[in-house]
Structure formats: structure tokens, C-alpha cells
Curated annotation (Swiss-Prot):
The keyword Cell membrane applies. This is Solute carrier family 22 member 2. Tyrosine phosphorylated. Mediates the renal secretion of many clinically used cationic drugs. Transports drugs such as diabetes treatment medicine metformin and neurotoxins 1-methyl-4-phenylpyridinium (MPP(+)), famotidine, ranitidine, amantadine, acriflavine, amiloride, memantine, cimetidine, cisplatin, oxaliplatin, platinum-based drugs cisplatin and oxaliplatin, 3'-azido-3'-deoxythymidine (AZT) and tetraethylammonium (TEA). Mediates the bidirectional transport of MPP(+). Metformin competitively inhibits OCT1-mediated thiamine uptake, leading to a decrease in hepatic steatosis. Keywords: Cell membrane, Glycoprotein, Ion transport, Membrane, Transmembrane, Transmembrane helix, Transport. One of its GO terms (molecular function) is thiamine transmembrane transporter activity. It comes from the Eukaryota. GO terms for biological process: acetylcholine transport; dopamine transport; epinephrine transport; histamine transport; monoatomic ion transport; norepinephrine transport; organic cation transport; prostaglandin transport. The keyword Glycoprotein applies. InterPro entries: MFS_dom, MFS_sugar_transport-like, MFS_trans_sf, Orgcat_transp/SVOP, Sugar_transporter_CS. A motif (Proline-rich sequence) lies at residues 283-287. The record marks 450 as: Involved in recognition of organic cations and participates in structural changes that occur during translocation of organic cations. Tyrosine phosphorylation of the transporter leads to activation of the transport activity. Inhibited by cGMP, most likely through a cGMP-binding protein that interacts with OCT2. It comes from Sus scrofa.
Amino acid sequence: MLTVDDILEHTGEFNFFQKQTFFLLALLSAAFTPIYVGIVFLGFIPDHRCRSPGVAELSQRCGWSLAEELNYTVPGPGPAGQAFPRQCRRYEVDWNQSTLGCVDPLAGLAANSSHLPLGPCRYGWVYDTPGSSIVTEFDLVCANSWLLDLFQSAVNVGFFIGSVGIGYIADRFGRKLCLLLTILINAVSGVLMAISPTYTWMLVFRLIQGLVSKAGWMIGYILITEFVGLSYRRTVGIFYQVAFTFGLLVLAGVAYALPHWRWLQFTVTLPNFCFLFYYWCVPESPRWLISQNKNAKAMSIIKHIAKKNGKSLPASLQSLRPDEEVGEKLKPSFLDLVRTPQIRKHTLILMYNWFTSAVLYQGLVMHMGLAGSNLYLDFFYSALVEFPAALLILLTIDRLGRRHPWAASNVVAGAACLASVFIPEDPHWLRITVLCLGRMGITMAYEMVCLVNAELYPTFIRNLGVLVCSSMCDIGGIITPFLVYRLTDIWHELPLVVFAVVGLIAGGLVLLLPETKGKTLPETIEEAETMRRPRKNKEKIIYLQVKKLDIPPN
């Protein structure tokens, strides 16, 4: 019997075909960034104030500067900084009356401007920005600010539902079909969102994008890890995520060039239409085909891979035939993720680690609050932090295995959060350095959980297992804003204490998982259950059988 990994040793483990396929799927990974973090630019909140009829005309007549206009016509902050009248309240004054002067125009109406009545922003807002965002177009500020939270929550809800549902479809009907379907829906809904006339329609199409986009990203990850040989599996998995980081850098540049949200949304959606050509470029996974007892199709793709790689299959491999003793096709089931003790343990630990990675990754970004007024540069610099994390993984994963670097990265992230609690604000650079160390640690953990998750499940439920477990990071993404902002109201450093506890627990749980370094991907439930023990060559229905007489002598 030969496994797919054995066959790839003959067809090429990472030759021209795999490199071409990796490049194509890496583009898909980079294109996912506008959906995952696009809210930074699509939902940008500029300085704003209530629109008051007559103020613009009075300012023009008097020749005021912007600072003078704000000083004369906009309320200042309330007592002890409570509330925000500058953004959400306006003077109940008729600015069109001719008695108003150009120097302190409110002096004749009240001895002190603080005694003037204030009212809500009945006429909308004025935004100090040359561009536009969904906030400025739909006035998602003040009493409506929660609608921006709902917009981001909707995409995370979509991630959660889509990861589970589409994960099942991908294992049931194939990786390629599901990938193309998610690309098409993502492209169409992205364009429709860009031309949405109302907030409600925009929210609906963003939810649809969430339903398919993350699932498509994960299917691309599964595909590339199933196409390459054992020795290259971890490398392409890491660089697939590095492609996401490159997408962050590109997004910053595109957003800078296109400050209007509709044009930005339309531009970042266009590549998805190009990805539909993958129908002719990316074949179905041979591993999935074999797991579904479609060995003829699998053999055809294997020959195609060998041809693209300039390899010739040995005569023994030309006579491959399916095991005739058992021909039942394996069908994925959610119960397979918890039915047996070891896989159940793997599932629970992986779900917790996905949750932890999302909470710490997004939480540290929110809590750190990058200094500076240039949104685009801040975003660009924060993305650069992720490259050293990938480098450290590449340097350690083959030498130390998966478990120990993964556990250490969680521990470092948790310890950095805890240490930063006791570091004073001055010197500021020291505190930022420690928090960046935590960001690097949790970035490593995020990349490691993707890699190991795919290695712990048998082929016929691998896609389902990855997508179900990774759905917990969507739950983390939904609650993290509330976790950060509500706990900060109690004590500014309290979120960091929570992050530390969560991260340290995650590091300990990782040590309960089996080491996957140097092991072939499990093909059956039994193999996944016995990963801690040395693997024996057993005949499995998802292997390809070779007649002993056809095997050339050693």
C-alpha cells in the first residue's frame, strides 16, 4: 500500500506544479485581508461635529479659520470630560440672525456660552476628512455609533456560520467546487456592497461576504497542504499566512490611494473575479478524491502533477487500483470530531486555542492604541510585526517540533501581557516593546494553530475539523471589543490580566496534544487516535493498493 505522501515522492513534493498552485492560492490569502481588517478603513471615524445651518455662511463672511469656527460655534467637552458635546450636541442658536458679530458671536446671547441650551444634531454632521467612509456616509456616530459595531459583528457572525457550514460542504462535495463557489459569492456580494444605497443593504452583503470569505481562505489553506509532500507541508502553511500579511501591506497602500470607501470596496473586490479562472488552474485534492473512493480521478490528477513537474511515474504506480475488500465511501460527520477520545481532546484544545489567538491578537491591537495621526502608516507598521513571527516559526519548527514552539509562543504572549501591567507609562518605549513582544508571540500562536489543526485530523474530516475549530476565533472576534472596552472602564490594565491568564492556559493545553513533526497526515480515525504511538503500515481503504508483483525489487 502507498499513501499520497509516498506517491508525491515520485511526482514531486514541491516542484513546478506545487509552486504554481501555491502562488495562486497565496493571492487568495492576500485578498482576504480587506474583509478581515477592512473595517479600519471602511469604518474610519474622522473628527466630526454637528452641522448647524448658517455657521458655514457666517464663517465665510467673517473669514474665520477652522480653529476659530470651532472655538466660536462648537460646544467644548463637558464636566470632567464626560459625554462628548463637541461631536453629539450643538448650540440651540439661530446662526442666520444678522445680530451675530464676528468676534465672539455668542457673547450677546449669554454671559457664558456654557449657559446656552444644547440640542441634538438634527441636521447631520460635518466630517473633517477629504475622503469618505461608511461612518461619514451613513452618519454612524453618536446615538448611531453602535451600527458600526453591528457592521463588524455581522462579518464575524458570517465567519462563524460559514466556517461550519461550508466546511461540511467542502468535505462532502470537494475542495475545488466549494472554493470556486465561495469566490463567486464573495465577488458578487462585494460589488453589491460597494453600490448599496442604504446601510441595511450594505450590512446584508457584508454578512454574505463573511459567510463565504473565511471559509474560502481556509479551503485554500487545506488545498495547498494536501498538494505538497510531507517535508514541505509546514513551510507552505506558514507562507500561506505570510501572504495574508503581505495583503495587509497592500491594503494600506490601496486605502491611501483610494480614500473613498465605495471605490476602495470595489477595487479590493475585483481580484475575486480573476480567481474564478482557478477552475482551469487548480485541480481537486487527490487526498480528498481517494478518501471518497474516487481513485480513477485521483490517479488522473496525480499523473497531471507528475507531468507538470517533469516527472515520470514508475511502472508500479501505473497499476494502482482501489482496495477491493472495502469500497465504502467515507462521509464526514460533525460527530466524528467528538466521537473518539483522542480526537475529542484534540477538538476541544484546538477550539480553545483558536479562541485565545483571536482574543489576544485583536485585543492587543485594540489595547495598545498605536500612537500617531497617520492611520495608513500606523496600519503598515503594525503589519510588519508579523514577519518576524513567521521567521521564528521557520527557524524552530523543524528543530523543536510543533508543540514546544506553539506552547512557548502562547506563554510569551501571556507573560508579556502580565509584565506590561507592572510597567509604568514612562518610559513609554519599554511598555510598547513588551506589548509588541506579546503581539509577536500571539501571531506565532495564530500561525501554529492553523498548521497543527490540519495535521491532527484524518483526510475525510480534515476540512470540517479545521473550519469548525477555527470558528471559535470568530466567537473571540465578536466578544473582544466588549472585553477590552468594558474591562478598561473598571481598570485600564484589567484586559491585559485577562489576556495573560487566557494565554498561559492555552500554552499549557498545547502540551497535551501529540507532536506532528515528521508524521504523515492521518487518513483514518484509527490513525488519528494513535498519533502518539509509532505508525504502522496498515491497509486502509483510502490508500491505493499496489500488486506485490508490480513492485520493483530493492
